[in-house]
Every structure is written in C-alpha cells, then in structure tokens.
Amino acid sequence: ARTTAPSVYPLVPGCSGTSGSLVTLGCLVKGYFPEPVTVKWNSGALSSGVHTFPAVLQSGLYTLSSSVTVPSSTWSSQTVTCSVAHPATKSNLIKRIEPRRPKPRPPTDICSCDDNLGRPSVFIFPPKPKDILMITLTPKVTCVVVDVSEEEPDVQFSWFVDNVRVFTAQTQPHEEQLNGTFRVVSTLHIQHQDWMSGKEFKCKVNNKDLPSPIEKTISKPRGKARTPQVYTIPPPREQMSKNKVSLTCMVTSFYPASISVEWERNGELEQDYKNTLPVLDSDESYFLYSKLSVDTDSWMRGDIYTCSVVHEALHNHHTQKNLSRSPGK
C-alpha cells in the first residue's frame, strides 16, 4: 500500500449519553498507511481517562480509535481537541469535539441528534500473536460494539469464515460505560491454520439503532515474512546508583508487525515491562523496543534475565536472548 494520510472524525455521545456527570468522547482515525499515528487530547493536557485502541488493518489501510472520559462540565465549558500526528505523511490534524447545541425549535428538543451520531460503532481485532503461534494456546478474533443504548440493548452477532457462517462465537455480558451506554463483545475461537493461511473473518452486527447491519472483516496481512533480529542492552552505568535499573530488548527487521515480546527472570515470567508499538522502518520492516525495570540489587547479584520473542518467521516461532551482569562490572 502507498503512504496515505489519515482522515479524522470526532465521535460524540448520543443524547442519552450526556446526562451524567461524566461523558466519553472519541476520535476515529481512518484510512492511513503506514503505522504509526499518535493521538493526543488537548495537546497532551488530557491524559487520564484516555483509552487508545490498537490499530486495525483493513483493505491495506489502518483504522484506530481513541476515547477520553471527562466531566460533563468540562466538555460543555471548555474546548476539547483531538490531535493526530502521522509521521509518514507529516500530517498533523486537530479536531474539536463540540457539544451539540439545542435546536431553537421545537422547545421540547433537549439536543439535536444528527442521524449519523449516537449510533453503535463496531471494531474488529486480530488474535494475539502468541495465541496464533503457540499450538497449546487458543487464538480468537474479537468483535467489539460500543455506544449501545439502554433503550435498544439487544445486539445480534453473525460470524463468517471466508463467507461461510459459523455458530461457535461467544458473546460476553453487556458492560455499562461511564457515559451510560453499553459495550458488547463477541469472541470467535479460530483454528491456527485458518489465520496463518489468510482466511477472512467477518463479524456482522445488527441492532435496532442501526439503519442496516455493520460488517467488519479482518485477515492476516499479506507479504513475505521477515525474521526478527533480537538484541539485549544492559542498563547504563549512570543508573546503578538508583533503586531500579532498565534492561532493554531491541527487536528489528521483522514482518508482519504481529509479535510477542516478554521477559523472564531466572526462568520466571516478569510483569514490570513496557513494549513500544511496532514501528515501520525505512525498509518496510518493523522494529520495537521493550524495557524491563528491575531492582538494582537483583541485577548486581547476577540474576539472569531473558527477552523472549514469538514471531511467525522464527524457527519454531520462538527465540530468546539472555542478559545478566558480567562478573566484575
């Protein structure tokens, strides 16, 4: 796909979603390539209550959404903006998320609901990389419906694999959101080989608030797989005087972007690590960094840390690199 700038659309709650003390606003970033984009609310001033969903690749272009939950009084009295940066096209887009004002007539109108606003939205998400590549795990495709109204809570899901309907999906109980709407999730457990062979998974959603069903599809990205290169980097000497030090795992030159990076200490899984999203490099491969924070004492006594990587292009889909303090250092 060629480099394409995103389009940005503000998402505002329906009339029923603005009556509480909190309101959830959204920003839909659609039709861009390649990854990544960054989304900031009020240029970064709004950071709590922000939830940015993973990007989804459809028909060669990415779509991503971000939401922020703020007090209703903030939205009605202050400007709320969504800023989207797309480095590949040097695009910087800003959208104001504006409250809908009451119509002057008839006087019974509380707010004017545009026909295209306040309806449920549908998102589809791929299986986790580790679930797909480890035969002992069960991969699943997930379909998420947001902004389901209290008045019309029934959501019907239909699932298809290569346009053949399947009936094995599971729908989870409705989750009430802070803005008074509901979130509904349906998951379809899939066969490892169906995803790896490029089969298309489709989620079809119907609800009385929708004029017609919404369909979302997803499949494994096409293209030749490239093997990740894994490098471990010890903590800098300047950190040794602190209580915690940072270990780094750099993973480069992989394709597709779907990858799992985890850490272990002396063979036990660690939790205190952060991964960047995969970033598209100049050669059309991806790279990412993972940072693990550890106690300085643990590092100094020679505990062995392992960066563990799962990717489809690796032999047996798995590799790992150890990192420990060299004696005398």
From Swiss-Prot:
One of its GO terms (biological process) is antibacterial humoral response. CDD domains: IgC1_CH1_IgEG (cd21817), IgC1_CH3_IgAGD_CH4_IgAEM (cd05768). Residues 98-113 are annotated as: Hinge. Gene3D superfamilies: Immunoglobulins (2.60.40.10). It comes from Rattus norvegicus (Rat). One of its GO terms (molecular function) is antigen binding. Keywords: Disulfide bond, Immunoglobulin domain. SUPFAM superfamilies: Immunoglobulin. Residues 1-97 are annotated as: CH1. SMART domains: IGc1. This is Ig gamma-2C chain C region. Disulfide bonds join 27-82, 143-203, 249-307. PROSITE patterns: IG_LIKE (PS50835), IG_MHC (PS00290). PANTHER family: TAPASIN. Residues 114-222 are annotated as: CH2. One of its GO terms (cellular component) is immunoglobulin complex, circulating. Residues 223-329 are annotated as: CH3.
